[in-house]
Amino acid sequence: MSDQVEIDLFEEWFEGEFDNWGQASSNPTSWAHIFVKHEKIDDHKFLTSSRYNYEPNKPYREQVVEVTEPVVLGAQVSIIIVKNPACDMIFSYIESEKMFLGHSCEGCMWKDKPLESKARLYKDKYHTWDKGYWQGSEGFFHFDKSYK
């Protein structure tokens, strides 16, 4: 896949609103119902926000992230870096699974605590796992893309 096709695909899948209603409703003691929104605000820049369902107009986390052009790092042929104020994320396209697999760079900190993040981005799903500041002992959040 060419670099431009890869970045276009990543941004198409990344943009939108996601929620984990299925996960939260099946196990409400372990999973809060959360909305995650990635809104394109400029070429390769997104305003990202996370909100609880009971405060839909009050994000608890909001930031601007920038998607960079794919680069070559070590054994990985092509990766996309999401520049994030908390911690940069590195994504690689896994063609056999039709997904982008992401992880945080080493040494990330959020509010003076270590942070390790993992993500899987599919056409209609976004799975995230933050360990450290938010604990993350239950595993991945499973967000489904909303089409309105």
Which sequence ranges carry the predicted segments?
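Short, solvent-exposed loop/hinge segments that bridge or flank secondary-structure elements
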Residues: I7-L9, E15-D43
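Short Pro/Gly-enriched beta-strand edge/turn motifs at strand-loop
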Residues: E17-W21, L47-S49, F100
